[in-house]
Amino acid sequence: MGTILDYLKEYGDYTFSEKPLNEVDSLVLCQFAYLKFDGIVPGIGENAPAVSMGYLNSHQDKDKLFADERYREKNTKLYDGMLKSARFSTLRMNYYINIIEPRQETQFSAVTFFLEDGSVYIAYRGTDETIVGWKEDFNLAFSEPVIGQIRSVKYLEQAAETFASPFYIGGHSKGGNFAVYAAMNCREDVQERIGKIYSHDGPGFRPEIREKGNYEKIAGRVIKIIPHSSLVGMLLESHAAGYMVVESKSFGLLQHDPYTWLVREDEFVRAKDIYKRRKFMDETLNEWILSMDEKQIHTFVDALYEVVSASQAETLMDFTADWRKSMTAVITAFKGLDGETAAMIKKIVISLFELAGERAKEGIKEGWQEKTEEGRMKK
């Protein structure tokens, strides 16, 4: 067993003509879509030819590809592994788009990959390291589509007009949600050409969003893959829905990281089901969200954002790096919240702090109790 990095070493000698795209290839491409292609890969409206892996490798701004601090080392290894493999070294890419609008609370990015066997994969980037991108995951709880979802449909239809072949579509995290949303809401002539739709630990949808779209038409082509302790992928997802649960070498929210998913040969290592404790938390959070009206959801998401933003961190890495400082700011920001909202946000924030490690998480719980006791004594 290994990870997608080991997969590139062990399976990289096979071309796509010899072995067609599989679930692991999909995750490789979705993670590759996180690279910062700005100024290197042509944009969706530039009418320029696709660029090759060799072009990326010789570009003067190559180092900017790895600007995402969270995954700089692993993304560099991914890139090197792809470049050295027969499977991905011939990859070409085009139609890159990257939009970040803090005021509109939206972050949208996508790129189209052209494979050696003539197949095409449209990949939507997931939540990046910004707090704004993370908030958009929770904005999916609204009954109306978010700006990123609307853009995902437009991008799909624009990109699909440039080639005639059937194609794959997918994404990790929020990108998985965008891929499914675009597939069920695009024009019928585009929808008919989609082979498989991959959602790698992507959030689900409110029932109203599914009903407005043509989800039933694409349901048989959707492949949803989640780690066995999924939080993000089970947001607005029913445990009765069809999804594949896979093993991860990590724990908690850290399992959202694609580099922790275990691979055996050309497929993920299957797990029996989601962990019981996580399943209970997922169900509790979803039931609570779905019980709220639009105004209450706005209040909850804004409160969650305000609590996390109180740390003055711009990225999740900043938020978890100095967890003691963040925790103090977060607890102060809890003043004024009603008990039920505060309790639910506390669970989510503790899950975020899993990124800081088990020792930090225990310290956070202890600190939370201390701060809570201090607050009671002052009253």
What are these regions (language model features)?
Residues 170-175, 179:
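Gly/Ala-rich beta-loop-alpha elbow adjacent to hydrolase catalytic centers
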Residues 179-188:
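Short glycine-enriched nucleophile-adjacent loop
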Residues 1-24, 29-111, 115-120, 124-141, ...:
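Alpha/beta hydrolase fold serine-hydrolase catalytic domain that processes acyl esters and thioesters
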